[in-house]
Amino acid sequence: MSLILPLEKPALNLRPLLWLLLPLLALATLFFWPLSLIVEQALRGANGEIGLETFRQVVDSKRFVGALLNTLQIAFFATAGCLLLGSVMSLILVFIPFPGSELIGRVVDTFIALPTFLITLAFTFIYGSAGLLNGALMSLFAFELPPVDFLYSMQGVILAEITVFTPLVMRPLMAALRQIDKSQLEAASILGAHPLRVIGQVIFPAALPALMASGSLCLLLTTNEFGIVLFIGAKGVNTLPMMVYSKAILESDYTVACMIALINIVLSLGLFSLYRLAASRTGVRSQPC
């Protein structure tokens, strides 16, 4: 006579859920809860009711429209400059090695660790009204006023951001260029292909994922950059992060500041979504920078 033993149910393993719960709890505490407070403050009108009154007030403001246009203009031009300068420098350092190229590559890596205000301070010492360049020109040509004054304009902000964020393009791009099969370049050279054609048909497709990833990172960082604009003190250059600062700290208008911050968040997410869409259309997989 056979005995039928009851099947024991396996014990429920809660360890995977615990490992999932801990990061979710930290994320909710450090990110979603403060974000919900910003959203609530932004949507709460003067009468205490939730609505879009503050949103309409902000959007109708010429100051906000100007800050939005300045933010987009600085972000796009700075990103384009980073991609152009980073591509040229990466091609030279990888495919045209020269004495000291390794040292320059290490200096580029060091730039990533430097705070943005330090680069801006160096720009002030060099291109400022009392900087080295203006001092030398005024001494040589007896100018009464500093001849170089682009630093305190939008062009100065863009140039400073290009200097700060170009290493973020070069680092992944140089890694991608070093993985290109040199035999393909040698074959194209033997067949008499023009260097520009080699770049367009061999190098560019291999470098496209790195360019897309680093370009999107630069676009997001330049859109939300605050320290460079504040430290340079460019006249008439107001951006969304600067407007959030002035509304919250200088004017104590926290409702409007939260609404502008919320719009800035939506803008950043929108730009990132455009990058993801472009990457999917071109068949590029996102890579970490």
From Swiss-Prot:
**What's the source species' lineage?**
Bacteria, Pseudomonadati, Pseudomonadota, Gammaproteobacteria, Enterobacterales
Q: Which UniProt keywords apply?
A: Cell inner membrane, Cell membrane, Membrane, Transmembrane, Transmembrane helix, Transport
The keyword Nucleotide-binding appears for this protein = no
Tell me the function of this protein: Probably part of the PhnSTUV complex (TC 3.A.1.11.5) involved in 2-aminoethylphosphonate import. Probably responsible for the translocation of the substrate across the membrane.
Coiled-coil regions listed: none
Q: What family does this belong to? A: Belongs to the binding-protein-dependent transport system permease family.
Q: Where is the ABC transmembrane type-1 domain?
A: 68-275
| Entries under PANTHER family matching the protein | INNER MEMBRANE ABC TRANSPORTER PERMEASE PROTEIN YDCV (PTHR43357:SF4)
Kindly list the GO CC terms recorded for this protein. plasma membrane
Q: How does it sit in the membrane?
A: Multi-pass membrane protein
Which subcellular locations apply to this protein? Cell inner membrane
Pfam families (UniProt xref): BPD_transp_1 (PF00528)
SUPFAM superfamilies tied to this protein: MetI-like
- Which parts of the chain span the membrane according to its record? 19-39, 76-96, 111-131, 150-170, 202-222, 254-274
Presence of keyword Transport: yes
Question: Quick one: where is this thing mainly located?
Answer: membrane
Q: Name one GO biological process term.
A: 2-aminoethylphosphonate transport
Q: What protein name applies here?
A: Putative 2-aminoethylphosphonate transport system permease protein PhnU
